[in-house]
Amino acid sequence: MLETTIDFSRYSSVKIGTPLKVSVLENDDEISQEHQIIGLANNLLIAPSAKNLALLGKNYDYICDKGECVEIGGAANASKIFNYFRANDLEGLEFLGQLPGTLGALVKMNAGMKEFEIKNVLESACINNQWLEKEALGLGYRSSGFSGVVLRARFKKTHGFREGVLKACQSMRKSHPKLPNFGSCFKNPPNDHAGRLLEGVGLRGYCLKRVGFAKEHANFLVNLGGAEFEEALDLIELAKARVLQEYGIHLEEEVKILR
């Protein structure tokens, strides 16, 4: 098993972190239940003390036409998947033109934008070398019900790439901040929006040391420059406490915190 050092202050989308050892997994028999897969670290906040970090190597970066379905390796990135579906006139993953991440993370969190999400197109996934049908994965709103590493997944083939869906997703992205961030900080509570709640307690544009909630959209935690893990964690806890006190609602993080 190969090992490398990754500086997460450069590698992660929020640009917060320290240099840490990361295992590079190239074969199924190297996978362990203890591994914390980092992918491209787009929706992660990684502690300086985080252990068992790993990423899938180049052997998992592929897209293969299987006839009735498309099989995609866990390390294939969203841009590559989007371009394949568009070039082959396939529908269902148009939103990946506006989302970062690797296939493994996209399946694990049932990634999506509004009503467009991974589970709408997914057929099955190989978790720790065991194939599971979609129904067994427990996919919900930005969540899943399985533990383990997504090594590969299969998607149904339906012809007819939808440019209209892509344009709708592009329009949604216009409100996203330009500063380093990890996408939505919190999941939307049932019948409400995290951004509305955060704005309601005065956190839109609010800064705490070197982190803050974006002026463009309150549900985006941004790195104002040189921020550290504890600063981001403090702001997340502050936001949860304020929303709970004001609205009686427990906000749940969409960002994954690895310790």
From Swiss-Prot:
GO CC, alphabetical: cytosol
Cofactor(s) listed in the protein's UniProt record: FAD
Name of the molecule in the record: UDP-N-acetylenolpyruvoylglucosamine reductase
InterPro entries in the record: FAD-bd_PCMH-like_sf, FAD-bd_PCMH_sub2, MurB, MurB_C, MurB_C_sf
Main location: cytoplasm
Gene: murB
Function statement: Cell wall formation.
GO molecular function, one term: UDP-N-acetylmuramate dehydrogenase activity
Enzyme class: oxidoreductase
Keywords: Cell cycle, Cell division, Cell shape, Cell wall biogenesis/degradation, Cytoplasm, FAD, Flavoprotein, NADP, Oxidoreductase, Peptidoglycan synthesis
Species annotation: Helicobacter pylori (strain ATCC 700392 / 26695)
Record Pfam families: MurB_C
SUPFAM superfamilies: FAD-binding/transporter-associated domain-like, Uridine diphospho-N-Acetylenolpyruvylglucosamine reductase, MurB, C-terminal domain
Region forming the signal peptide: none
The keyword Glycosyltransferase belongs to this UniProt entry's keyword annotation: no
Disulfide bond residue pairs: none
